[in-house]
């Protein structure tokens, strides 16, 4: 689910770690991901493909002598079925769309389309009730905010224009709370969305027929956990989400993280560790961080140094303390000890919407990386073309070398102690970086 701040660096320009002790493990992780993508396709949480793929992961980890544990939980799920939006006038045309999750079945209906701009109340024209809203790709509102305003104005559906050209869609969650949406929301290609917008701007009536059969359904799923015991029970948690959207193979988002975690487990399985390392493949991240929310909850009072989140992490150019000032000195020690420095060193900028957020809400410090992925690969995330051929082995090899070094730095640093923020400090973590409004809009926060 991660949206990267920098995605335009060509692969050739990304930092290379060179040949390292981690290479064989990284190549094993990449090979595993290739089998996972080609054997099972997309890993939508709750689907048969997701379950079978997770079982395969457990089998291959067990073959390495590890003891993976299924951490089972129930969550509000969603099942994609056959949905359609058909233009009836001025032309008859089946539009390329994909429903956002938590869109629910309804009787087919026909309605005119109205341009609602960026989805704010002030953008609505008069007479929108009973129509289908065309939403700009440039909206800064959370989906929950867009839907609430649309409901107040009596819309029957929303067509959300994709930000990428080339006939792409952007599947995404419609709700972080797991509640069924009061009206269906569809991603529509940029080309067809802009076309409809031009027709409306000329005063042409655009009428569509909407059919939604996808449905909300509770699902039982699981995270997969590997614990590598250290001399101390203090733990460093390293996690990334296992699930993906269903249109493609989920190779970039987040098969990349799946491979990096596999490589880490492969590399550390026989290594003496000062602290315990807990490696977690989370399920249900794309629907609303459900797996990491469960994992953070069942941690209880376990002593945790930090959580490291691997969500679409290319080759790191910086390591990020995600707003926790107390982590910065340790990360600076990691950077100082590197023979090849990370070009942008240590950053300390918080953002929300991936699994680290769940741990931050539990008061646990989190770390991730500034790690750009080539635009010609990352542009396809959440769509049909997010496939293994977009991910060169070299990215997994070079990124794993840096990630593994960073994890071991956290494991071995004597200056670190387990730490939990209190609720006020957590509130400040979100407000200080201006993400408090978005956190509230998703329903993830406040928790007290």
Task: Briefly describe each language-model feature range.
Residues 61-62, 137, 150, 158, ...:
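Alpha-helical metal-binding/catalytic segments enriched in His/Glu/Asp
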């Amino acid at each position: 689910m991660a949206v990267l701040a920098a995605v335009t660096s060509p692969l050739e320009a990304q930092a290379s770690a060179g040949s390292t002790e981690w290479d064989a493990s990284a190549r094993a992780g990449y090979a595993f991901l290739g089998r996972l993508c080609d054997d099972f396709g997309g890993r939508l949480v709750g689907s048969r493909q997701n379950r079978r793929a997770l079982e395969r992961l457990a089998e291959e980890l067990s073959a390495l002598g590890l003891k993976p544990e299924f951490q089972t939980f129930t969550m509000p799920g969603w099942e994609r079925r056959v949905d359609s939006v058909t233009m009836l006038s001025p032309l008859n045309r089946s539009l390329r769309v994909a429903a956002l999750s938590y869109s629910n079945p309804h009787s087919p209906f026909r309605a005119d389309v109205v341009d609602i701009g960026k989805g704010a109340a002030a953008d609505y024209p008069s007479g929108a009730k009973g129509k289908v809203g065309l939403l700009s790709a440039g909206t800064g509102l959370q989906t929950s905010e867009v839907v609430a305003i649309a409901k107040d104005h009596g819309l029957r559906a929303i067509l959300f224009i994709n930000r990428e050209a080339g006939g792409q869609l952007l599947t995404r969650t419609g709700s972080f709370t797991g509640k069924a949406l009061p009206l269906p929301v569809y991603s529509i290609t940029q080309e067809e969305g802009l076309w409809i917008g031009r027709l409306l701007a000329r005063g042409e009536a655009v009428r569509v027929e909407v059919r939604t059969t996808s449905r909300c359904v509770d699902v039982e799923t699981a995270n997969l956990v590997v614990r590598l015991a250290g001399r101390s029970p203090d733990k460093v948690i390293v996690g990334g989400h296992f699930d993906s959207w269903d249109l493609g193979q989920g190779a970039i988002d987040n098969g990349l993280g799946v491979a990096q975690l596999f490589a880490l487990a492969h590399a550390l399985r026989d290594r003496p560790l000062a602290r315990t390392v807990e490696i977690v493949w989370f399920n249900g991240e794309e629907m609303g961080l459900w797996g990491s929310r469960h994992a953070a909850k069942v941690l209880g009072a376990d002593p945790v140094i930090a959580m490291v989140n691997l969500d679409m992490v290319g080759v790191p150019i910086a390591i990020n303390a995600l707003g926790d000032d107390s982590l910065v000195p340790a990360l600076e020690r990691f950077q100082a000890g590197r023979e090849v420095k990370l070009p942008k060193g240590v950053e300390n900028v918080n953002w929300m919407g991936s699994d680290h957020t769940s741990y931050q809400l539990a008061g646990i410090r989190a770390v991730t990386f500034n790690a750009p992925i080539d635009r010609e690969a990352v542009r396809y995330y959440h769509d049909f073309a997010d496939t293994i051929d977009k991910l060169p082995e070299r990215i997994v090899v070079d990124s794993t070398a840096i990630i593994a070094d960073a994890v071991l730095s956290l494991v071995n640093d004597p200056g670190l102690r387990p730490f939990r923020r209190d609720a006020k400090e957590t509130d400040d973590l979100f407000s200080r970086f201006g993400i408090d409004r978005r956190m509230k809009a998703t329903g993830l926060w406040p928790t007290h």
